[in-house]
């Protein structure tokens, strides 16, 4: 008896801890803080379905408790046979019609929302408005590539989009199945190797300001040992700032290095790293040859490898042993041993990669 009670207490304790930890996430890394039109629609459907489920549970629980108390066996009536009821057409109609009504209440807005979210005609129109933003998202183990086909720009890890308007996405994977998800803004949708998925999102400017100008995205499909580390950042900008960013990226030149140590790092980079990485956003290589993240704006990024704080020490840690940071990544083992001097030089060079 005491052992069972002890186990029950432990179970209750772990249950309370799980509930407490569920509320400890970062701001705007939750579907419960919608930050755009799609997120608002999905949140409304969650509230609707949850409300219906709670209503059903409460009503059934009340009826259950009432029946247990009202028709319980009383003292002295142990041998009394209760009145036998063959059935009730009225009750049968009620408990058939009510679920149908509840299903319709849930189904109608769900179907309408599904068709609205699936409307991507604007992105497939060859004569689409020049201001319509389309992003080709390519998922790789364990990093993200973002291509803006109408602007000729390619970036990695940091997604830049305009606020308060629809942004359309083409989703595909280069190796295994992944899933593109920005919890606060909407999603999620799978990226497959053999077909493209399409959808759209809207990034709210007020919510962006509250979030500090950055949203967090993740891979939401188990894809390997570093699945949990396959993050990316989203930087929504007002339309005028987004246009300025596009112009800056389109006019980007090959970086000119003046620092002697950084020059040494550039030489090391050009011997091997350049075969996979690019240092300009105007990368003309086909997708099959873009086997590693574009590093054009590496010096201005939020994170190293999508997860480490952006500083020189973490970059050196990544260069020494990428597998210790992201197990199973494809960069590990592609280059020989680097001396500390070479790592220092590479770090200096990579930190200087900025689009001015």
UniProtKB/Swiss-Prot annotation:
The chain crosses the membrane at residues 45-65, 93-113. Binds a copper A center. It is a multi-pass membrane protein. Residues 260-356 form the Cytochrome c domain. Its cofactor is Cu cation; heme c. InterPro entries: CcO_II, CcO_II-like_C, Copper_CuA, Cupredoxin, Cyt_c-like_dom, Cyt_c-like_dom_sf, Cyt_c_oxidase_su2, Cyt_c_oxidase_su2_TM_dom. Keywords: Cell membrane, Copper, Electron transport, Heme, Iron, Membrane, Metal-binding, Respiratory chain, Signal, Translocase, Transmembrane, Transmembrane helix, Transport. Its EC number is 7.1.1.9. This is Cytochrome c oxidase subunit 2. Residues 24-259 are annotated as: Cytochrome c oxidase subunit II. Cu cation binds at residues 178, 219, 223, 227.
């Amino acid at each position: 008896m005491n052992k069972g009670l002890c186990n029950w207490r432990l179970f209750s304790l772990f249950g309370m801890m799980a509930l407490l930890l569920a509320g400890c996430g970062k701001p705007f890394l939750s579907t419960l803080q919608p930050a755009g039109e799609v997120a608002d629609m999905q949140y409304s459907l969650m509230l609707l379905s949850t409300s219906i489920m709670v209503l059903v549970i409460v009503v059934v629980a009340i009826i259950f408790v009432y029946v247990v108390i009202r028709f319980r066996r009383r003292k002295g009536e142990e041998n009394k046979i209760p009145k036998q009821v063959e059935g009730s057409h009225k009750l049968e109609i009620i408990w058939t019609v009510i679920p149908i009504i509840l299903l319709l209440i849930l189904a109608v807005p769900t179907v309408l929302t599904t068709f609205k979210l699936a409307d991507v005609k604007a992105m497939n129109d060859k004569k689409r408005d020049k201001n319509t933003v389309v992003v080709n998202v390519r998922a790789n183990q364990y990093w993200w590539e973002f291509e803006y086909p109408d602007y000729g720009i390619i970036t990695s890890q940091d997604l830049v989009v305009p606020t308060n308007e629809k942004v359309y996405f083409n989703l595909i994977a280069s190796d295994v199945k992944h899933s593109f998800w920005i919890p606060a803004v909407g999603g999620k949708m799978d990226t497959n190797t053999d077909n493209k998925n399409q959808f759209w999102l809207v990034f709210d400017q007020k919510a962006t300001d509250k979030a500090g100008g950055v949203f967090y995205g993740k891979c939401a499909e188990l894809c390997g040992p570093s699945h949990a580390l396959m993050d990316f950042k989203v930087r929504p900008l007002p339309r005028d700032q987004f246009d300025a960013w596009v112009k800056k990226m389109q006019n980007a030149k090959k970086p000119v290095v003046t620092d002697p140590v950084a020059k040494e790092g550039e030489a090391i980079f050009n011997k091997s790293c350049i075969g996979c990485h690019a240092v300009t956003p105007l990368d003309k290589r086909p997708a099959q040859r873009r086997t590693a993240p574009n590093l054009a704006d590496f010096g201005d990024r939020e994170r190293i490898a999508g997860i480490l704080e952006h500083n020189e020490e973490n970059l050196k840690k990544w260069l020494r042993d990428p597998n210790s940071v992201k197990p199973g990544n494809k960069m590990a083992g592609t280059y020989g041993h680097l001396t500390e001097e070479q790592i220092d030089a590479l770090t200096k060079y990579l930190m200087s990669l900025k689009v001015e």
